[in-house]
């Protein structure tokens, strides 16, 4: 059996939704569409901007095509603007859909699959590498430094890290290089 059960999704997403600004549309008592935003900071050409990170965008299929999400997005973006957030970001599951809704792509994720035979067996270098948990303090500090010098990089808080790893934690390894001086 694959996929997520309703209770698993609720349990997984609740920590995000309780700390985000959530807009919803109801049909009577039933939530039929939602749009959630939580605050982050982003390095844009060496200046730090407050941004709204959009997540949990959904509408039941039988309600699509009625402009509900468009209205929720406009309301959410208007609120972000009032709060001084200069940009809204999301990771789209469908680039054509969000492009149709007026969103633009600012970056791409690149993944590499490296076979073990492509890695040198022994390389003399000072220091060592250790696998660490995704919530490792040194890893987060390293990422914060990287964000401070890298255009387009988010400064991730605990909530953003939870959201980032939510779907990949089981099959992802994090490693930190420690330089011995």
Residue ranges: model-predicted function:
Residues 2-44, 151-174:
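Active-site rim helix/loop that mediates acceptor-substrate recognition in acyltransferases
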Residues 30-35, 52, 180-181:
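Glycine-rich phosphate/pyrophosphate-binding loop shared by adenosine-nucleotide-utilizing enzymes
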Residues 41-48, 114:
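A short, polar/charged loop-to-alpha-helix boundary motif
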Residues 54-64:
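A short, internal acetyl-CoA/4′-phosphopantetheine-binding micro-motif in the GNAT/acyltransferase core
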Residues 63, 80-81:
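Hydrophobic pocket-lining residues that define ligand/cofactor binding sites across diverse proteins
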Residues 63-75:
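Conserved acetyl-CoA pyrophosphate-binding loop and the N-cap/start of the following alpha-helix
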Residues 82-86, 92-110:
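Conserved active-site alpha-helix within GNAT-family acetyltransferase domains
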Residues 109-181:
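Amide-forming acyltransferase catalytic core, primarily the GNAT-like/NAT-type
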